[in-house]
Amino acid sequence: MGAAVFFGCTFVAFGPAFALFLITVAGDPLRVIILVAGAFFWLVSLLLASVVWFILVHVTDRSDARLQYGLLIFGAAVSVLLQEVFRFAYYKLLKKADEGLASLSEDGRSPISIRQMAYVSGLSFGIISGVFSVINILADALGPGVVGIHGDSPYYFLTSAFLTAAIILLHTFWGVVFFDACERRRYWALGLVVGSHLLTSGLTFLNPWYEASLLPIYAVTVSMGLWAFITAGGSLRSIQRSLLCRRQEDSRVMVYSALRIPPED
């Protein structure tokens, strides 16, 4: 049962991200480099947040449970703010790299657009964030006959997996909206990205009341997904065009196959 829970939760948590990586990133070496570099930036932000939280815990009264819980909330907020600061720093770095690539190309154009960089960097932040948030839970899931931890809900592992999937997608959407806001200098959009990130992080403290945390987080995920879709230039008309193109391609394949001469026996 432990192995089934482990693999099931792993596929739920990282299935969408793995599919996005294979379809949109793995085939382009430049995107893979941006993905790895983005993960490094997120790790540095986590390291700094951990140092801040570690210092605060050791300079305060560790026997005061309420104080320590408050420090945990404060540490989560600091971590969110540092992640967004490093997202901005990564945007600046990619902007410089984009200008350098454009100057080196023959036609004066960069081989990758800012929107593509935003998507890949957001995906990198999401994947590494998901790995660090759920890896210990998945390790505990491998235990023999594990259903819950210390009498917690039997849905603990499954809800954690769905929460991780939402966080990964949110980071992807945040990256797209954040980079676009930086390009157009829309400071209100930057504020909404940071605010939604803080809200999502705060909602996780409502666990194990999963109805009060998971449902609002997925509502935020859907909202940010629609915003990122529109920001990237998507619309209902573009969806219709993509569907029509697929239908036309399918019809062409059918016509071609129908016109082929059957092989002689």
Swiss-Prot record:
Segments on the Lumenal side according to the record's topology features: 1-2, 53-68, 140-158, 208-213
Membrane-crossing residue ranges in chain numbering: 3-23, 32-52, 69-89, 119-139, 159-179, 187-207, 214-234
Pfam families in the record: Aph-1
Top-level taxon: Eukaryota
Gene Ontology CC entries for this record: early endosome; endoplasmic reticulum; endoplasmic reticulum membrane; endosome membrane; gamma-secretase complex; Golgi apparatus; Golgi cisterna membrane; Golgi membrane
Keywords attached to this entry: Endoplasmic reticulum, Golgi apparatus, Membrane, Notch signaling pathway, Transmembrane, Transmembrane helix
Side Cytoplasmic, residues: 24-31, 90-118, 180-186, 235-265
Tissue: Widely expressed. Expressed in leukocytes, lung, placenta, small intestine, liver, kidney, spleen thymus, skeletal muscle, heart and brain. Isoform 1 and isoform 2 are nearly expressed at the same level.
Endoplasmic reticulum keyword on record: yes
Topological type in the membrane: Multi-pass membrane protein
Annotated compartments: Endoplasmic reticulum membrane; Golgi apparatus, Golgi stack membrane
Primary residence: endoplasmic reticulum
Single GO MF annotation: enzyme binding
One GO biological process term: Notch signaling pathway
Family under the similarity heading: Belongs to the APH-1 family.
Matches recorded under PANTHER family: GAMMA-SECRETASE SUBUNIT APH-1 (PTHR12889)
Subunit (UniProt): The functional gamma-secretase complex is composed of at least four polypeptides: a presenilin homodimer (PSEN1 or PSEN2), nicastrin (NCSTN), APH1 (APH1A or APH1B) and PSENEN/PEN2.
Entry protein name: Gamma-secretase subunit APH-1A
Organism field: Homo sapiens (Human)
This protein's encoding gene: APH1A
